[in-house]
Regions:
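Residues at alpha-helix caps and immediate loop-helix transition turns in enzyme cores, especially N-
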Residues: 17, 46-49, 175-177
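Short coil turns linking two alpha-helices in DNA-binding domains
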Residues: 28-31, 46, 60
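Short alpha-helical DNA-recognition segment
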Residues: 15-35
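Short, solvent-exposed alpha-helical "recognition" segments
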Residues: 37-47
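P-loop NTPase catalytic core
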Residues: 82-347
């Protein structure tokens, strides 16, 4: 089957305020978001949806739909992200969270890890005063105060470099991120992976808070409240890389089974919270216990948090993550203990 995906970069460039534009032609912003991230494969989209998007972008269908192009994944060594919502190299990642869910810790960890991989890291300072951003400065190479300054820093560093750019949602809403994208396109600077965050916590109420994204990290209040970090929701977080035709079959199979288990586990957990575990039949109890183990395994110590947690940061390769998750999915009730799986790296044989 031919690989098809939306030209997300073109949509971002041509339709700055996609939420409003989509609604104006009768499209649900959530549908557009799911098509952009690959949660809904392009091949399964309604024809009228694709045509409407092409009309909004003022482009042909051939320009809107990319055929046969590969999407390269940046492996982070963070289990929950690499498994459920991997980063597309040169793509845009949107973080959706309310304050206190740990998005800045995840962002700081990403900057730390990518800097170690040779990326030049740039922070575009927020328009408003946000002293909490000081926490990520240790792993930022350059701090810019405007789009022009950001662009000039990239030019000075060299167009052949790999960049990571962090920016607040305000720059998306003002249209300045699209201006920067045009400037980068003019100079053929393509190795820019962007992290967008919403420091005001308003993005959670918007179906399409940043416009089209390659990767969405939806943070979870329940996980944060129970100190299951990183508190990234494995059900609602997604990536264009997860579109079946792009993904390694083993990764795709494990990801689908793990997500199915966690979805059911969350349903059962709501019952257990109210009525206790004794209310579950034996078959469901096994599912619940497996979900508990998997949720625990997906927690992970971060390098940037070492001074606060006293735990050494760990990196787990994707191959090891897939192998470990497969073991948990196939485990018997007596195998593994959820407490022993919490905040570890890989499962030691």
């Amino acid at each position: 089957m031919e690989k098809l995906r939306l030209n997300v970069a073109l949509l971002r460039k041509r339709v700055p305020n996609l939420t409003t534009a989509a609604k104006s032609v009768g499209l649900r912003p959530a549908t557009v978001s799911n098509l952009s991230t690959g949660k809904i494969p392009v091949g399964r989209a309604e024809v009228r949806t694709i045509v409407a998007l092409a009309e909004l972008a003022g482009c042909t269908l051939d320009e809107l739909i990319l055929r046969g192009e590969s999407v390269e994944m940046i492996e982070t060594g963070i289990k929950i992200l690499d498994l459920f919502a991997p980063i597309a190299k040169g793509g845009t990642v949107g973080l959706v969270a309310r304050p206190g869910m740990g998005q800045l810790v995840v962002l700081a960890e990403m900057l730390h890890r990518l800097k170690m991989e040779g990326y030049k890291t740039i922070l575009l300072n927020p328009k408003d005063n946000h002293p909490e951003m000081n926490d990520i400065l240790d792993d930022v190479d350059f701090v810019a105060n405007s789009i022009e300054e950001t662009f000039n820093m990239m030019i000075s560093a060299g167009v052949d470099k790999k960049f990571v750019l962090t920016a607040d949602r305000a720059y998306v809403l003002s249209g300045e991120m699209y201006t920067l994208q045009e400037m980068l396109d003019d100079k053929d600077i393509t190795e820019v992976t962007t992290f967008l965050l919403d420091l005001k916590g308003e993005a959670v109420d918007d179906d399409l808070p940043y416009g089209p994204l390659d990767t969405l990290w939806q943070f979870d209040a329940d996980l944060a409240a129970r100190h299951k970090y990183p508190a990234v929701n494995p059900i609602y977080s997604t990536s264009s890389i997860l579109e079946g035709s792009y993904l390694d079959p083993v990764h795709h199979g494990v990801q689908q089974k793990a997500q199915k288990l966690l979805r059911r586990y969350r349903e059962l957990r709501s019952i257990v919270t109210v009525h206790g575990v004794g209310r579950l039949p034996e078959s469901e109890l096994q599912v619940y216990k497996q979900g508990e183990k998997l949720e625990a395994y997906l927690t992970q110590p971060f390098y940037v948090a070492e001074p606060y947690t006293g735990k050494k940061g760990v990196t787990v390769g994707l191959k090891e993550t897939l192998s470990d998750v497969k073991k948990i999915l196939e485990s018997s009730p007596s195998e593994f203990n959820a407490e022993d799986l919490q905040f570890i790296g890989k499962i030691e044989s």
